[in-house]
Amino acid sequence: MRHLLFALLLLAGLARAELPETDWLDLMPPEDRQALEEMPDISHDSPEGNSLFYGTNGLRQQNPDLPAVMYSSKTVPELDGKAVRLGGYPVPLESDAQGNSTLFFLVPYPGACIHVPPPPPNQLVLVHYPSGLRLDDIYAPLWVSGKLRVESVSNELADAAYAMDAREVRAVTDEDLD
């Protein structure tokens, strides 16, 4: 009986253990990573109105001055169905009746999709989180855990090459940074 109780306690602890962090660059195939590392820095400080990423009609358009890697939808097939934990920033898309965000893009840097340019599609994850999360500050980083899917998603803000049904979403704490 003791051994059974110990095994159950051990399994319960393992079930609650956090997944190791997945790096955003792991979502890109090696050739995209290399192209991204070789391109010049992009300013994320300009307002969208001054950007070449939006046409006069307000719709997204590609900037011909940027390399193709900035629009890459190439994915890493081995990640399809894999349980991951990604750290990133939310871009809210839908909320429930209480104002909690239930659908959002998770992006690797703050201000993405709000200040341009948006990340490449293979650097955006559409997160479904039916439990909802109160987002008081979209510039505060989150940890999102769940099964990653290779899934092409498009809306007026951006295109994503991945989606996730999150099982846990939480704010990054000071202890996480130690």
Question: Can you annotate each of these PLM segments?
Answer:
Residues 1, 12, 160-164:
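Extended interaction regions within the primary functional domain
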Residues 1-7:
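Sec-dependent signal peptide recognition
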Residues 8-17:
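Hydrophobic h-region of N-terminal signal peptides that target proteins for export
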Residues 17-178:
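OB-fold and OB-like single-stranded nucleic-acid-recognition modules
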